Amino acid sequence: IEKLRLRTTASLLSGRKDIIVISSVSCLYGMADPTAFASKVTHIFRGMKIDRDALLRCFVDAFYVNNKVEFKSGCFRVNGDTVDLFPAIETFDGVAYRIEFWGNEIDRISSFDPLSGREIDEQEELNVYPTNLFVTSKERMAEAIGQIDVDLGKQVEYFKEIGKPYEAKRLYERVVFDLEMIRELGHCSGIENYSRYFDGRNAGERPYCLLDYFPKDFLLVIDESHVTVPQIRAMYGGDRSRKQNLVEYGFRLPAALDNRPLTFEEFESLTPQAIYVSATPADYELIKSEGVVVDQLIRPTGLL
């Protein structure tokens, strides 16, 4: 699912107007700030003047890993003036790219099969997207780590005051380990639970989601709306209940509560144009449509 979301965001950031995204209600869950994600996209082209090591630093900042032993999605490898890259969004197509340098200039870009090494074709340009949806700048990361550290101290002290030493110990060990991973690798398992710090959001402020990546004039189509709309309404409450337990028992900081799906009101504010498709529309759809209803007769399969 993560790879599909990466590919979707890459398509939306391409600027094309003919993109169709098919998604479940999970599209309302938190993602990175679109501006921060776009800032980590590296555009390269044949004839581009750039130092090889500078390009490799761009890849590392986008969470690519230098791996000569196991060349897989999200990795790159270096052999002299040649850099092989396996973009994260190409996982399903199985296409990797070879970037050849002549001094400090990109001389050639080609795609190839990472299993056989067979060249597929030449490329004039290439966009390299991050391997992770939660990206941020080094400055923002340093600030976020400081804020996480402060909140950890407050929450540990709170647990000790109310007589929960085991919860305090569990939380301390978990968050300290996560911070070490973030400092070393730039990310950790469950980093989305710290997204509020990396996005610079205040407590309670809505997270960014897939809908923020769409242009302002996008059209939303909700299929089986009599079922989907109630699901959207219930998502926030269900997620909140589960996360509250994680916080109370010391598995997560309170900031994890802000890694959440949108409330129904927030969802409505992001979807100015919508078509509700249903054989049995509820009162909500009928009221929202203000009487603008189109009937469609669908032939039952096998009867005619």
Predicted segments with their positions:
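ASCE RecA-like P-loop NTPase motor cores
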Residues: 1-304
